[in-house]
Amino acid sequence: MEVTILEELFQKISEVTTVGDVGYHRIEEGRLKPFYKTQTDILGIEKWKTVHGQNPVYVKDTFILREITTKKQPIEIYDTKNDTRSADAFFLFGIDSIMIIPVVREDEVKAIICIASIGKYHQFTKEEMETCSKLADDYLKNQY
């Protein structure tokens, strides 16, 4: 996958949501593999990859990932601290609100895009979820 495609996609997603931290994780061998994210002052790429490397996230052990890989639909959480679906990794990165978009190929979730609001809450709207999902489909249609 070309990083330039993700850079363009993430720019569009940030414009739609006003949220700057956007990351792409592949799902391989039953776990998240961080691939690329936006470089922000809040959470840089190297820190993101290092923390994920030290704290692997397995689909089978993470309720919200099991839900996404089963339903194959975007999910949003407004308040991660008070939502039982929240993953431990959300707290490692200080995520307050999150939208997760599955990248589905041949009826299987191959990757996820996380749009993470860090340091403030963000109410992701139905329109934002639909627009971001369509953008992801359009930009990533020839990937995998």
Describe each PLM feature range.
Residues E2-E15, M129:
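Short amphipathic alpha-helical segments
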Residues F10-S14, V19-P34, P74:
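Short, hydrophobic-rich beta-strand element in sensory/regulatory alpha-beta domains
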Residues G23-H52:
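GAF sensory/regulatory domain recognition
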Residues G44-R85:
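Regulatory sensory and allosteric helical modules in signal-transduction proteins
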Residues F90-I95:
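Short loop/turn motifs at secondary-structure junctions and domain boundaries
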Residues D96-V104:
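A short, aliphatic-rich beta-strand micro-motif
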Residues V103-S117:
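Sensory-domain boundary capping and coupling elements
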Residues S117-K134, Q143-Y144:
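Regulatory loop-to-helix N-cap segments in sensory/regulatory domains
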